Amino acid sequence: AALYASLANSNTGSYGLVCVTYSGNTEVGRKTVYGTIRVVPSRAAPIFSAFDFSASRTDLTGDSSKIISGVSSVTVTIPVADKATSTTSAAIVKYIASVGNATAEAPWSEDAYVYIEVPNAASGTVSVAAVDSRGNQTIVTKLGTLIPYTPPRVSSITTQRANSVDSAVSLQAQGVW
């Protein structure tokens, strides 16, 4: 525990070990050895296992686990009971939420819910990483349902009067929708 505490902000540190030999009360030899001590990241990663998420636009989908590609925002919620912790003297610093290539982060909290909003989500995979002061991470992933969506594109619009003089007008649009 003391070694972890001395490396609260790094996975590596230097040490010096001095070995002194005595004959009675008289020092007869001294040897100093220097080295590097390493924290194994996988053994010192934050303890984190749960979060909740909710996608916007339930008015269209009827279900907060359905994500409309490029339209929905995803709000990640980490309840106090599910907050990340450390058993190796590192401080939990932040959470990073990712939905495909869209990411957002928020600081860790000891006693409050943490909310992270990821705008313009374009994936059904929602991941949250708990990051400690050494930079070690534990990632938890949940799956939502991705609803593909492409906004309409109008490539041309033409108008034409019937018989070139009537008040009725024909409107033609071309594109993808």
Question: What are these model-predicted stretches?
Answer:
Residues 67-98, 174-177:
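Solvent-exposed loop/turn segments flanking beta-strands in beta-repeat/beta-sandwich domains
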Residues 38-70, 146-168:
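Short, compositionally biased P/S/T/A/G/V-rich stretches that sit at domain boundaries
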Residues 27-39, 106, 136-146:
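Edge beta-strands of extracellular beta-sandwich domains
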Residues 2-15, 114-124:
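Surface-exposed, short loops/turns at beta-strand junctions within beta-sandwich domains
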Residues 19-21, 130-132:
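Conserved structural position at the C-terminal beta-strand
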Residues 15-17, 74, 126:
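Extended alpha-helical scaffold segments
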Residues 102-111:
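Short beta-strand segments within Ig-like beta-sandwich modules, predominantly Fibronectin type-III
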Residues 23-25, 37, 84, 99-103, ...:
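Solvent-exposed strand-loop boundary residues in beta-sheet-rich modules
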